[in-house]
C-alpha cells in the first residue's frame, strides 16, 4: 500500500540510532529515547496560501531530516511505523 500525504504534510520513517553508549553499554529498547532523525517517504503537494497560491514542500523523498521529539502523528502501514507531520515540524535536512 502506498500513502500520499495532503497539503504540506510529510511521511517520515524514523531512522534507528545507536543502541550502545559511548562506554559500550547496550541500551535496552525500554530505556532508549525515540530517534528524532528520519527519512522522508512521501510529501504532499504543498501549502495553499491565503492568496490562493501553492507553496511547494521544500523537502524531497529520500531526504534525511531532523524533527522535534514530539512532532507528528504515529501511524502504522503494512506493519511499518511512520510519522505524519507538517513540514513546519521539520527543523533541518542533513546534507552530504
UniProtKB/Swiss-Prot annotation:
InterPro entries: Chaperonin_GroES (IPR020818), Chaperonin_GroES_sf (IPR037124), Chaprnonin_Cpn10_CS (IPR018369), GroES-like_sf (IPR011032). One of its GO terms (molecular function) is protein-folding chaperone binding. It comes from the Bacteria. Its main location: cytoplasm. One of its GO terms (cellular component) is cytoplasm. Keywords: Chaperone, Cytoplasm. Coiled coil: none annotated. SUPFAM superfamilies: GroES-like. One of its GO terms (biological process) is chaperone cofactor-dependent protein refolding. It is found in: Cytoplasm. Heptamer of 7 subunits arranged in a ring. Interacts with the chaperonin GroEL. Together with the chaperonin GroEL, plays an essential role in assisting protein folding. The GroEL-GroES system forms a nano-cage that allows encapsulation of the non-native substrate proteins and provides a physical environment optimized to promote and accelerate protein folding. GroES binds to the apical surface of the GroEL ring, thereby capping the opening of the GroEL channel. Belongs to the GroES chaperonin family. This is Co-chaperonin GroES. The gene is groES.
Amino acid at each position: 500500500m502506498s500513502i500520499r500525504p495532503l497539503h504540506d504534510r510529510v511521511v517520515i520513517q524514523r531512522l534507528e540510532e545507536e543502541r550502545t553508549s559511548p562506554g559500550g553499554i547496550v541500551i535496552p529498547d525500554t530505556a532508549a529515547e525515540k530517534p528524532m532523525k528520519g527519512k522522508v517517504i512521501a510529501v504532499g503537494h504543498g501549502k495553499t496560501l491565503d492568496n490562493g497560491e501553492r507553496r511547494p514542500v521544500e523537502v524531497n523523498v529520500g531526504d534525511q531530516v531532523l524533527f522535534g521529539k514530539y512532532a507528528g502523528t504515529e501511524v502504522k502501514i503494512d506493519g511499518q511505523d511512520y510519522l505524519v507531520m507538517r513540514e513546519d515540524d521539520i527543523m533541518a535536512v542533513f546534507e552530504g
